Structures are given as C-alpha cells and as structure tokens.
C-alpha cells in the first residue's frame, strides 16, 4: 500500500485538520496515512510548533492500524540534538520525519527569506545547516521537503539546480544513505513545471549515489491536499 507519510492535524500550530477526515480521505483514495505533527523545539515563538506528545498518543492511539500510523515531524537544528533524540526514542512513533525549518537560527518562512541573500548564499547556508543536522541526528527516518525554501524565496528562479549545488547535495545524500535514512518526495510543488524538472534532477543524483528508497508526503494541512 502507498502511504502519504507527511500530514498535519490539529496538534500542529498551523493546522486544524481532524484525524477522522484524514482517515476518510485515505480510505477513499485507498492509501495509508501517517500523521506527522510539528515538533520544532527551537522555534523562536514560545509554544508554537510544539505539542504534548502523551496527549497526542492518548487521543490518537485508538485510530492506529495497518493503514493509519502515528508519526512526528521533528525540526532538526544543531541546538536541539539531544532533545530531539529523546523525543524520538522515548515515544512509540511509527515514523519520524526530519526537517530543516530554520537556517542560522532564523525561521525560513518568517525571517530567513528576508535577509537579502543572493540565491547562491541563500541555498548554500541552507544546505550547510542541513548537512550539519543530518550528520548530528540519528533520530529520523526520512529527510523531508528538501525544496522547502523554494516555496517562499523570491529569486528569478526559485528552484534548486543540481548544477549549482551538486557537491553539497551529494554530501547530504551520501550521509543519509550511509546512515540508512531516506529522502522524502514531497508532492506539494510537483504541479509546478519548473519544480518538477528540478526535483527530477535532484532525485536522479540521489539515486546515482545509491539512494534506493523515498517516502511520499503531501505535507497536507487539510484533507483536500492529501
């Protein structure tokens, strides 16, 4: 069965999706679903993008089945390695996404995109932080939405081009592969022709380096996007 392994319910600050609606869409589309609510311990706004894990399991455990899984999306930063490891280790998650939502301590969506970097600087700093995080963390199964900043940056061409960032992408992918981690194929921007082409090149590099598997995730925050 194919799983949509990246979606957010009411336990995420930026979503109010009801798990029952997500389950219904999964049944309608004949796919499995994995709930992966946000846990960004280093998020600059106190209490946002964090949730009470015991309450999450107390409320959702009754829905767990062969095609409904309970996961988490952990924001990877160099400042929260031990705390992130503890969350992943101490709770019975079926699946853990690792994500880069901040660069140089700045939230990508709120602050980082407004720092005035040119495209080369913008993505180089992003990938440098990503490489450090995947080297330091062992708590995740799949690295999510590698093109996340492309949603918000404002360059003439927002896409990640392998020709521009091949060396550091190769370091990241080799680290993932050597650790037994995989890369997520995030579907949120695949409808954009330029994104589709750029992502094909990125995943070809991943495959050429020995990557055998991907997880598929919509990053849905509402049932319509599953």
Regions picked out by a protein language model, each given a short descriptive name:
Residues 1-78, 90, 94, 152-154, ...:
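An N-terminally biased module of ancient metal coordination in phosphate/nucleic-acid-related enzymes
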Residues 47-178:
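Extended substrate/RNA-proximal surfaces in nucleic-acid metabolism proteins
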Residues 45, 107-108, 194, 226:
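Short glycine-/acidic-enriched loop or helix-start segments at secondary-structure transitions
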Residues 21, 83-87, 201-205:
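A short acidic, amphipathic alpha-helical/loop segment
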Residues 33-35, 96, 143, 183, ...:
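Hydrophobic residues within beta-strands of alpha/beta enzymes
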Residues 27, 135-136, 208-210:
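Short hydrophobic "helix-edge" motifs at membrane interfaces and signal-peptide entry regions
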């Amino acid at each position: 069965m194919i799983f949509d392994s990246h979606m957010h319910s009411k336990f995420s600050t930026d979503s109010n999706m009801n798990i029952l609606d997500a389950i219904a869409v999964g049944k309608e589309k004949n796919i499995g679903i994995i709930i992966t609510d946000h846990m960004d311990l280093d998020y600059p706004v106190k209490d946002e993008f964090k949730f009470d894990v015991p309450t999450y399991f107390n409320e959702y455990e009754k829905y767990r089945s062969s095609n409904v899984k309970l996961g988490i999306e952990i924001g990877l930063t160099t400042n929260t390695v031990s705390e992130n490891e503890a969350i992943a280790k101490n709770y019975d998650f079926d699946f853990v996404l690792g994500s880069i939502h901040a660069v140089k301590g700045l939230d990508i969506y709120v602050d980082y995109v407004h720092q005035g970097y040119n495209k080369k600087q913008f993505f180089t700093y992003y990938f440098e932080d990503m490489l450090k995080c995947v080297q330091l963390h062992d708590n995740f199964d799949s690295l999510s939405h590698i093109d996340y900043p492309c949603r918000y940056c404002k360059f003439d061409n927002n896409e990640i081009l392998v020709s521009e960032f091949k060396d550091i992408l190769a370091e990241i992918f080799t680290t993932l592969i050597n650790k037994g981690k995989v890369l997520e194929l995030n579907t949120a921007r695949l409808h954009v022709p330029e994104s589709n082409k750029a992502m094909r090149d990125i995943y070809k590099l991943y495959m050429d380096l020995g990557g055998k598997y991907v997880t598929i995730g919509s990053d849905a925050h509402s049932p319509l996007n599953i």
